[in-house]
Amino acid sequence: MENKYVDLQENICSTFLQLFNTKMHWFKEMHPNDEKSIIDYTCTDRKDRKCHVELKQRLAKIDDYDTILLDATKLWAWTKIGYSDTLNDEQRLYFNFMNDGVIIYDINNQSEFKFYPRKKIWNPAEGKYEYRDKIGLPTKNAIIYRYNKDGTMTRVKNERYNKTYRD
């Protein structure tokens, strides 16, 4: 079933990923997964690793969050991919496009997961509140890029953000 809100969000996030990659050159190849896939993209990074990439747009600033919530079905989908594929060197990346930058989680290297069962959320695609299981990921364990006024991006380097995927 077609949902214009979902299609619009997918297009926006795809555009943000392409712009991010144009500036930062993380991926050599980027392929959107089909509509039935739970994970948005399959990419190949600069080290020739396969990356399973989930995208999310958030209408907020980076510093508004100390934890980003991930739908539990996404984490379970990544786990299923990990068990079904034979390659151990596959990356699971969660991109959050914010008003002032990008928060990226390397799921393979996350040690802190907080489970939020039956979290009440507004689903704009359905126009109603729903209860969903969520996984909390602390922003201190994320890779953070901030937008600069000249259109470039700068990797945040301070003690709040630990070493992860690209260091």
Regions found by a protein language model. Name each.
Residues R58-I81:
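Mg2+/Mn2+-dependent nuclease catalytic core
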Residues Y41-C43, K47-K61:
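Conserved catalytic cores of phosphodiester-cleaving nucleases, focusing on short active-site segments
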Residues M1-N33:
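Acidic-basic catalytic patches of nuclease active cores, encompassing PD-(D/E)XK
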Residues G82-E112:
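Nucleic-acid nuclease catalytic cores
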Residues S37:
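Beta-rich catalytic cores
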Residues I103-D167:
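Intrinsically disordered, low-complexity terminal regions enriched in charged/polar residues
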Residues N21, P32-N33, R46, G82-Q91:
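Intrinsically disordered, low-complexity coil segments
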Residues W26, Q57-L59, N109:
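A short beta-strand motif that forms part of the nucleic acid-binding face
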